[in-house]
């Protein structure tokens, strides 16, 4: 191809690195991930210390679920730019996926030092504290987040999950009730409610909640076992 000929002609030309990087982005938009990876890697062969190009490739690795390769690129970015928001955020995400919770917490803390009050980092801290069973700290952060973002349904659902984990089922139901008012077509809310009702032995209410979830789009086979159990 013409671009490979350009590389052979002037292998060290910086413009070639940019050319490959841009080509990789175009290929990625077209869904040609394998070709895009090759282009990003060619760009990085020419400019191995380019933060932008490392982030581009890391992001694509992450999309393709190549966590270990994405991790290496994000680490290299942080070595070059210790305060890079994107790299800190996504390396923390990778740590969470690997269940390396203390490492994730360290990155979220660093991110909050770089961007005080960053919403993603605050949510990350709440979730990582939950995973570390530091429930009080997790709940306090979720409480602050919900005060700051009262219409964010995902936060209400996340706090409800924490309340279920700590056996505060009535509080969880209150949060899910608030979430349902904000997002009446969110089927997952009704599945969560149904599970809590089952835990409480309120089978009839559980059945109604599961049926509502089916009505809102969850395939019936996915909830078949729950529907059957709640009919007993």
Regions found by a protein language model. Give the residues of each.
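Register position in tetratricopeptide repeats
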Residues: 29, 63-64, 97-98, 131-132, ...
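Helix-start (N-cap) detector for alpha-helical repeat units in TPR-like alpha-solenoids
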Residues: 14-18, 51-52, 85-86, 119-120, ...
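Structural marker of alpha-solenoid helical repeat scaffolds
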Residues: 9-12, 46, 80, 114, ...
């Amino acid at each position: 191809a013409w671009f490979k000929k350009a590389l052979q002609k002037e292998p060290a030309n910086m413009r070639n690195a940019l050319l490959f990087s841009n080509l990789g982005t175009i290929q990625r938009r077209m869904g040609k991930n394998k070709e895009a990876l090759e282009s990003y890697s060619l760009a990085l062969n020419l400019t191995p210390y380019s933060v932008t190009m490392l982030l581009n490739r890391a992001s694509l690795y992450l999309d393709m679920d190549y966590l270990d390769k994405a991790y290496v690129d994000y680490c290299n970015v942080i070595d070059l730019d210790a305060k890079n928001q994107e790299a800190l955020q996504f390396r923390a995400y990778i740590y969470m996926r690997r269940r390396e919770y203390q490492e994730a917490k360290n990155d979220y803390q660093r991110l909050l030092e770089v961007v005080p009050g960053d919403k993603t980092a605050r949510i990350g801290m709440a979730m990582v504290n939950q995973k570390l069973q530091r429930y009080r700290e997790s709940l306090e952060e979720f409480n602050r987040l919900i005060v700051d973002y009262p219409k964010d349904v995902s936060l209400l659902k996340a706090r409800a999950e924490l309340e279920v984990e700590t056996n505060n089922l009535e509080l969880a139901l209150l949060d899910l009730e608030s979430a349902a008012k904000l997002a009446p077509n969110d089927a997952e809310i009704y599945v969560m409610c149904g599970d809590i009702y089952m835990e409480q032995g309120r089978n009839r209410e559980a059945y109604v909640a599961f049926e509502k979830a089916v009505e809102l789009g969850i395939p019936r086979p996915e909830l078949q076992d729950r529907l059957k159990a709640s009919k007993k």
